[in-house]
Amino acid sequence: MCGRFTLTVDPAEFQDKFGNFTFPKNFAPRFNIAPTQPVLGVPNNDRFKADFFMWGLVPMWAKDPSVGNRLINARGETVAEKPSFRGSLKYKRCLIFADGFYEWKAQPGKKSKIPFYIHMKDRKPFAFAGLWDTWNSSDGSLIRSCALITTEPNELMAMIRRMPVILHPRDYAKWLEPSAQTPDQVSPMIDPLSRRGNGCVPGQHAGQQSVYRCSELVVPAK
């Protein structure tokens, strides 16, 4: 499960990294993005324009938007079968941008867990494989929401737990294909990223409480 991530890169550098997409001109660095908060993503609507989604998928048929609190992650192994996710996998896929994420490792015999901050070795931003949907309330308001797809861990993450699917740049266009896609067409992209691209360091506090939002969260623990 992925329950916290970061997006701290300068907007100008971000635009250089993802030149095929259009982004908001300004967005503040965020060191502890938590469920129900807005996240930056690009939907597969053929416009290649980034916008903000609420993290926690609310299917269009949901009776209450609070269901999104429980639908922050979709397991890659079962995403094509689960009613909450299978429609979005077929019709509504998105990229969710980040430059790192947090995970916690249990310590034998202890209640406390060791926090880890996982990022690319070059500290560059990347894109998670996401699903999105829209939900209309009775008063006409609209909620656009998303979930991150998770997968089995690579060698680096195996010592901790599962990991979110980080898409290879060559797969961005295929993932954002606006037409309907079958599970067989998208499943090859739902794989753990090679360890060669990841770095992993113990973090300070590591964002287990969403009120922590300072840069100290991503400083390696001493």
Regions found by a protein language model. Name each.
Residues 1-222:
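Short linear sequence motif anchored by a di-proline
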